[in-house]
Amino acid sequence: MFPDSSYLFSMRSLSRFLIAIFGCGALLASCDSFERSVLPFDKTDELVVITVNSPDTYYENAEGSYAGLDYDLATEFAKELGMKVRFKTVPRLDKAWSLLEKHKGHFAAGMNISAKHSRHVAFGPIYQLVQPQLAYNTDYNKPKNLHQLGGRTIRIAKGVTHAEQLNKAKHEVPELKWKEMDLTPDELLARLAEGKVDYVVADSTQINLAKNFYPNLNAAFNLGDSVGRAWAFSPFAEQALLEATQKFFTRIQQDGTLTRLLDRYYGHIERLHHTDVNGILAKRRTILPELREHFYEAEELSGIDWRLIAALAYQESHWDALATSPSNVRGIMMLTEITADRMKVTDRLDARQSILAGARYFALLKDKLPTRIKEPDRTWMALAAYNQGPSHLEDARILAQKMGLSPDAWVDLKKTLPLLSQSEHFRTLRHGFARGGQAVVLAESVRIYYEILQKYEPPYSWGFPIVARKEDDSWQEF
């Protein structure tokens, strides 16, 4: 869950941050001879950000662009300041702390607040709460507490704050053992899934992300209290930078930007059960090879990543070309008769016809959305429209506007789509009742299946859309 705004921006947090501002300013005044590694904030147009290269903060996505919560936050911050942004990526957190201490960047992003580091750095406002947890391999018995580890060694990534929680726990569990490793939490969790280490302590977000790729991973129990995540600044950070940071986080919390970004990266990660993950991983080896060429062709036809089309097909039918619902929705893409006719499908149970038609229809739904709706929200809304139709999606957008929410933000439509099944809402809308909750489930599930396929399946590396839409009647308005 996301942190409560009253916690994130409490007066206590603000007071601590303002103390840090004036403390750092005083320290800077007494350190004129300090040799800087980055230009002063007020003497440069480039913001230098230190961050770890990981799916939790900063990474290269399937399109070859950079993404991640802290990438988006830092980019938005630089844009607000009218500055360029440059990222210094490191493989592990200990390297990030080291670079920060040497003032190699203006701040380090995605850092967990800890008592140890608070003595040496200033932390900005908390923008996310994470829960340290003990992860275990579900092929073995689940420990209920630290006493049940049987003398086995816990692994943690070097530079993380979890050593502080473990040191506290050792007072009650003297036999507790752990080892810091020159690996990222993601790499440690992969080793845990492979049975190469006994236990791993990591943040809840990291474990939940990893569970979608390694279904034999799970959290056994929480370790201590939740921890705030924030940007960390060296003692030599300028007062103007610290004040600008406070102003920025206050703004994005108040206008909903922070909520939307947290939902973009974490709002869907706990949707699937481990059996769902096991299912797609197994069928990826047995069924997907027979369908892969059809999905490649669908990407050429629609311009949509074949792995997204395959994820949608898996959610709809588990890649069963003969799937049929009680309402006569049929085929691998579960097309209605009306949609099949519109897409000129002669046999809905023909896998190739169904996949190509489903991809074209999905692309058409995306094209019909207002151009102001940006990715990735545009894709998630198109998925919802694929499930319940564009008219009901538009009703949900209208309802969002009536409720003071954004009709262009997926995080807000996740709230209004389920309301389409409630009479107090749907009787006020043009298109009436809809099972909008189903659309949310479909879109959120496809998001995870897509991430799984992105991890294990390479992109289709050649070819461009080969069908001219104007020459194909099935691309016309509907």
UniProtKB/Swiss-Prot annotation:
PROSITE patterns: TRANSGLYCOSYLASE. Residues 271-478 are annotated as: LT domain. CDD domains: MLTF-like, PBP2_YfhD_N. Its EC number is 4.2.2.n1. Transmembrane segments: none annotated. GO terms for cellular component: cell outer membrane. It catalyses: Exolytic cleavage of the (1->4)-beta-glycosidic linkage between N-acetylmuramic acid (MurNAc) and N-acetylglucosamine (GlcNAc) residues in peptidoglycan, from either the reducing or the non-reducing ends of the peptidoglycan chains, with concomitant formation of a 1,6-anhydrobond in the MurNAc residue. InterPro entries: Lysozyme-like_dom_sf, MltF, Solute-binding_3/MltF_N, Transglyc_AS, Transglycosylase_SLT_dom_1. It comes from the Bacteria. Its main location: membrane. It is a peripheral membrane protein. Residues 1-29 form the signal peptide. It is found in: Cell outer membrane. It is an enzyme of class 4 (lyase). Residues 30-269 are annotated as: Non-LT domain. The active site is at E316. GO terms for biological process: cell wall macromolecule catabolic process; cell wall organization; peptidoglycan catabolic process. Keywords: Cell outer membrane, Cell wall biogenesis/degradation, Lyase, Membrane, Signal. One of its GO terms (molecular function) is peptidoglycan lytic transglycosylase activity. In the N-terminal section; belongs to the bacterial solute-binding protein 3 family. Murein-degrading enzyme that degrades murein glycan strands and insoluble, high-molecular weight murein sacculi, with the concomitant formation of a 1,6-anhydromuramoyl product. Lytic transglycosylases (LTs) play an integral role in the metabolism of the peptidoglycan (PG) sacculus. Their lytic action creates space within the PG sacculus to allow for its expansion as well as for the insertion of various structures such as secretion systems and flagella. The N-terminal domain does not have lytic activity and probably modulates enzymatic activity. The C-terminal domain is the catalytic active domain. This is Membrane-bound lytic murein transglycosylase F.
